[in-house]
UniProtKB/Swiss-Prot annotation:
Belongs to the IPP transferase family. The record marks T105, R128 as: Interaction with substrate tRNA. The gene is miaA. The keyword Glycoprotein does not apply. This is tRNA dimethylallyltransferase. Residues 39-42 are annotated as: Interaction with substrate tRNA.
Amino acid sequence: MGEVQREKVAVIIGPTAVGKTKLSIDLAKALNGEIISGDSMQIYRTMDIGTAKVTQAEMDGIPHYMVDIKNPEDSFSVAEFQERVRKHIREITERGKLPIIVGGTGLYIQSVLFDYQFTDDAGDVIYREQMEKLALERGVEYVHKKLQEVDPESAERIHANNVRRVIRALEIFHTTGEKMSDQIEKQEKELLYDVSLIGLTMDREMLYDRINLRVDLMMEQGLLEEVEGLYNRGIRDCQSIQAIGYKEIYDYFENRASLEDAVSQLKTNSRRYAKRQLTWFRNKMDVTWFDVTDGEKTSEILRYIEGKLQVKSNNSK
């Protein structure tokens, strides 16, 4: 018997504000594709402006998945993302379409593409109970700070009030000596799909200017009112509110910052995040990069995907 043919998947990654959304829709039109969001925050309903969620108009009739699937108060894990996205890949492929994953949440995308197993073994019960006791006696912030010291990446992703996940991350570090956020690295990294992995990049100053402009546009579009709606619903200590664009404006509503300072902090955090995204992708994944400083490279990228995945675009028929 011959080798089982792997499903073909195109993946578009890159920092925030680099132009992934438009490119993905152009590619989906040309390649008979459907889009899966690889963004850990666009899953939340009513959080549209701050997550730069693709609009119905931008979708232009192209089906999108993993958008608006959770309420802001719901928690969401990498394991659930992996399971859902792999199901979408199967279903899109069965319909004779090309799955296109687009987003900037590297760990989530990597968990889908590679043979990454999520373990939830018994761990160290005594240590876990010690941490639970500490959380009760000294507060959740104290335990979260301990996580920040050993695994800042996980601490950034997990809200202090999500005590179970904070302690789980601490427990993994305690028992293995490795960060939960680095677990992927010690597993066999075998690609499960026939993947074309495209990265968009541009001149740093230009990217930072685009990020600053995007934040200004978000404020014009009603980001303040969007966050106020969440705040008035009593949504406080949730995973979703840890997102850049929300935690900064929450500081304004909690009287911890002026609106001007909150917006300034949002710009700073967005620029830092873009820098971290680029570093992560360059260190962790084998990406073919396209520099879009001087404009779109849609035709060039389309030709590359056609060659890599042996698929034909509408343009080449």
